[in-house]
Amino acid sequence: MGFRINTNVAALNAKANSDLNSRALDQSLSRLSSGLRINSAADDASGMAIADSLRSQANTLGQAISNGNDALGILQTADKAMDEQLKILDTIKTKATQAAQDGQSLKTRTMLQADINRLMEELDNIANTTSFNGKQLLSGGFTNQEFQIGSSSNQTIKASIGATQSSKIGVTRFETGSQSFSSGTVGLTIKNYNGIEDFKFDSVVISTSVGTGLGALAEEINRNADKTGIRATFDVKSVGAYAIKAGNTSQDFAINGVVIGKVDYSDGDENGSLISAINAVKDTTGVQASKDENGKLVLTSADGRGIKITGSIGVGAGILHTENYGRLSLVKNDGRDINISGTGLSAIGMGATDMISQSSVSLRESKGQISAANADAMGFNAYNGGGAKQIIFASSIAGFMSQAGSGFSAGSGFSVGSGKNYSAILSASIQIVSSARSISSTYVVSTGSGFSAGSGNSQFAALRISTVSAHDETAGVTTLKGAMAVMDIAETAITNLDQIRADIGSVQNQITSTINNITVTQVNVKSAESQIRDVDFASESANYSKANILAQSGSYAMAQANSSQQNVLRLLQ
């Protein structure tokens, strides 16, 4: 090789290598000091793009986890509030159960109702004040609320919390048929009991025999209540139209085929002769006699079989119908209509021409006065449904005139046939009580008025035409049947809250599972980003040592390259 002075190639090569080593050393020091393999786009352009995408995904997943935890906090707040509401409903049902026995007086029942009213107020207070970050949770407005729980848009979970005010829960369906006066065989079917299928009950005979009647039908319905969601009660009761008046039964007087015979009884049955005679055979007839607070005779079927009177119980007893199979009441806890079909439905007062009282009652509605329509649907009344009116002295005026002791005597100017003109009652609803022609204008007869002296028939002023119809009932548990109804309504309310809580619980579990999943995903994404972005200290330390040594050796090489030019001077000596 020749000796040159102008261009020191060896020195230039040494410098170039030193520059490379210097950059490698700077990069290595930058990585070791930052802990990152990629400190700028120049370090790894494609790797940086992937790492940035992974970092964005990991950060978004972190916020999604926070969103999920916020959602859990909201749902847990609502859940705990409803847990307290359930305790209140349990107390309401307990107090209603306490009121549902005739050992309670009106005074004590009123006190229990006052307690229930306060409990309902607190239940509504919880519903109206439970909130999270200013959002009401239990008032019905928290519907289809979305929570972003993914790294991409529209990866959401929806949550809804139903309203829990007393006006929104406990809605219970009550349906009560008309009073039945005919026997038969009933084949009852519940239509679409589960939204799809029909449910057919076993046929039940409606008669006066043991093991038949509305009691047997109610037992069959209640036996399947867990499947259909429908429960039944019955009220087979014949109540006198007025306080017992002196009279007597016929020699062949019988109830449900059991002959009782002739019984003389006084006003109000003061000596108890009529009631005692009927109760003497109650184990055989299934019918028990008593007097109500107004002194009226009450015949009650204990097991739900019909009540059939043959012979004559006498006008003084005030019993309108010699054959009575009672009223059937149905209760459904979800507030929807009870759709029925079948055969022989007129025997249970639910035929095509029968007036069926229907109502859906919420928890709050049970707090105040129960309307006549609601009371009748709940089965408060033993009479015909729909509030129809009827003549109370007999099934018709003609029938009344035909009975002994009616006050109509020969020569009075009233014949049995003339009574047909009064055998229809005109009101908001019309009920025919016997075959009728028209209302005669000859005799002025009005509800509760009797005949006036001016009519020329003052000797018959004892005749009355009255009404028997549904009427308003006092609030809640202040009556026995009201207490029973509040028990049903409270049970429905408990079921409603349990359904809402169950839905909340399902969403909580869904969110928890999602949080667990995206937490694992976030860890894996961060791990993948770390593999790309973070420095491997072991490897980079080796690179640093290499670059450091090369930098030192490069400096030495440059020094040697520069000193090698001195050899040219020796040639010139």
UniProtKB/Swiss-Prot annotation:
Q: Which GO terms describe its molecular function?
A: structural molecule activity
A single Pfam family it belongs to is Flagellin_N
Instruction: Name the SUPFAM superfamilies on file.
Output: Phase 1 flagellin
Q: Which domain of life is it from?
A: Bacteria
Q: Does the keyword Secreted belong to this entry?
A: yes
UniProt function note? Flagellin is the subunit protein which polymerizes to form the filaments of bacterial flagella.
The protein's name in its UniProt record = Flagellin A
Record the organism.
Answer: Campylobacter coli
Q: Which gene encodes it?
A: flaA
